[in-house]
Amino acid sequence: MDIFRVLTRGASVKKDGKQVDFSRVQSQRTARPGQRGKDEDEEQLSRELDFFRTRRSVPAAAERPAEETGDAHRDETEQDEGAEDVAPPPRITTAEEASQLRRSYRGKVTGADAPLPIGSFEDLVTRFKLDKRLLSNLIENNFTEPTPIQCEAIPISLQNRDIVACAPTGSGKTLAFLIPLLQQVISDKAVGTGVKGLIISPTKELANQIFDECSKLAQRIFLEKKRPLSVALLSKSLAAKLKNQIVSDKKYDIIISTPLRLIDIVKSESLDLSAVKYLIFDEADKLFDKTFVEQTDDILSACSHPNISKVLFSATLPSSVEELAQSIMTDPVRVIIGHKEAANTNIEQKLVFCGNEEGKLVAIRQLIQEGMFRPPVIIFLESITRAKALFHELLYDKLNVDVIHAERTQVQREKIIERFKSGDLWCLICTDVLARGIDFKGINLVINYDVPRSAQAYVHRIGRTGRGGRKGTAVTFFTKQDAIAVKPIVNVMKQSGCEVAAWMENIAKMTKREKEMIKKGKAFVDRKQISTVPKILKQKKRQQKEMIEASKKRKLAQQAGDASEEEHA
């Protein structure tokens, strides 16, 4: 098909300079021998735009029986309900085809009786009778072809199997668990049982994002007695309403929450999770580490349905976390796309040696001068104090910048994220609070101002760029103090297919002692304050502060002495 002819259709002008009157019906021209007619051309265009092959083939009016054409006022909705979709055959039908598809995206699937992957979203209609309204919402949101993790995870989930899934950042993991979750809730015939699906996220920002995506796919979907499918984010206000019994927990089909808030509401007996059949842990490596593992255990205890399906998704999957996760599952299927410790291959990764802390500020200003600082940019630091300090330093460079961290209120964080997404902010300085799952469109550059504390943290940080098939760049600054901490990052770069210089190869080799130091967090040191103030000025300020404090102490001592003299007198 000539795409230029299609794009210019309706834009032609008559040779005499007069515009074509498109309000009149044009007479149908007869196609020359060897050429397609207009109807054939339109039919081919329709077929190419019908991604999911859901369009019904309706005969032309001239070819219909007389009694069929005579009923001009027939209700279209009745026609839709009466007609049956003829779904196309699935693209993947044999184990050999599945193996070939998996080789194309380096996918590894292990587990008893793992189902074949899907080759397209059309396969969901053929193999699993995907709900028409859910399919329509997918089309409206421009989801036309499944990503590798979606090809594998969706059919496994639709067979109610437990999953441990690992795929690179920005590879479509959210959709991989939302599509089967919504389909299973729609298919569930149980009425008035309460929450059926539960999604756990380690951060509020990620929970918000999942809620937005789930709400888009759940639009205009009705369950029993024309009740709309209800998705809720367990916010502070909703938690208060549940505690005060202003709303019933039976009202919601799917709830998305962070662990601590969910445990709090469950312990108050305001939310019953005994009917949950589909439990999803997003960013499972974080939820199963020592920070959240107790809360995760409490959630698993509250979800007591005998036929519950557990699904775990993450961009990184350490062996310790995987062992713990598999211990709570029944006959799970393990899905790995690429390497479980590798970063997204669309990201160009760089290491920059800065010598010391002062050199980092020089390096970031050099990036700005050389034109490598192309907005939008995210800069990660290891602490709130350092994030604030860098924010004040970059304000002097007249950058359109803001900072986000755990000390900001939820409203402030949401406003900053909205401004960054809309382009009002060019640069966002943050801690690891934004390192996981948040999908910012078109991030060009990620800067690790401080070396991440683990290979997993590094993969999640740089995963804010290179999402959805786009290219991105990640730059990591390191100093002499980071000699050990930078070694896991070099290994991630090698596994991701990045070019690694000879000097990097040498520092990448870790001894057993160094591995233990990194695991225990002893490879990381206390860093100096971020500042360009000269040392002599800092010393003067410190001396001035000491003088003021000494003066205050003398005054207090004098006042205490005067008071004791008055008492004796």
From Swiss-Prot:
Chain positions of motif DEAD box: 282-285
Biological processes per GO annotation: endonucleolytic cleavage in 5'-ETS of tricistronic rRNA transcript (SSU-rRNA, 5.8S rRNA, LSU-rRNA); endonucleolytic cleavage in ITS1 to separate SSU-rRNA from 5.8S rRNA and LSU-rRNA from tricistronic rRNA transcript (SSU-rRNA, 5.8S rRNA, LSU-rRNA); endonucleolytic cleavage to generate mature 5'-end of SSU-rRNA from (SSU-rRNA, 5.8S rRNA, LSU-rRNA); maturation of SSU-rRNA; snoRNA localization
Coiled coil residues, start to end: none
GO terms for cellular component: nucleolus; small-subunit processome
Disulfide bonds: none
Top-level lineage group: Eukaryota
Record keywords, A-Z: ATP-binding, Helicase, Hydrolase, Nucleotide-binding, Nucleus, Ribosome biogenesis, RNA-binding, rRNA processing
Location(s), subcellular: Nucleus, Nucleolus
Residues annotated as binding ATP: 167-174
EC number: 3.6.4.13
InterPro entries: DDX52/Rok1_DEADc, DEAD/DEAH_box_helicase_dom, DEAD_box_RNA_helicase, Helicase_ATP-bd, Helicase_C-like, P-loop_NTPase, RNA-helicase_DEAD-box_CS, RNA_helicase_DEAD_Q_motif
Pfam families: DEAD (PF00270), Helicase_C (PF00271)
Molecular function via GO: ATP binding; ATP hydrolysis activity; RNA binding; RNA helicase activity
Reactions catalysed according to its record: ATP + H2O = ADP + phosphate + H(+)
Annotated ranges, domain Helicase ATP-binding: 154-335
Role this protein plays: ATP-dependent RNA helicase involved in 40S ribosomal subunit biogenesis. Required for the processing and cleavage of 35S pre-rRNA at sites A0, A1, and A2, leading to mature 18S rRNA.
Domain comment in the entry: The Q motif is unique to and characteristic of the DEAD box family of RNA helicases and controls ATP binding and hydrolysis.
Assembly description: Interacts with the U3 snoRNA and is associated with the 90S and 40S pre-ribosomes.
Protein name (database record): ATP-dependent RNA helicase ROK1
Organism whose genome encodes this protein: Eremothecium gossypii (strain ATCC 10895 / CBS 109.51 / FGSC 9923 / NRRL Y-1056)
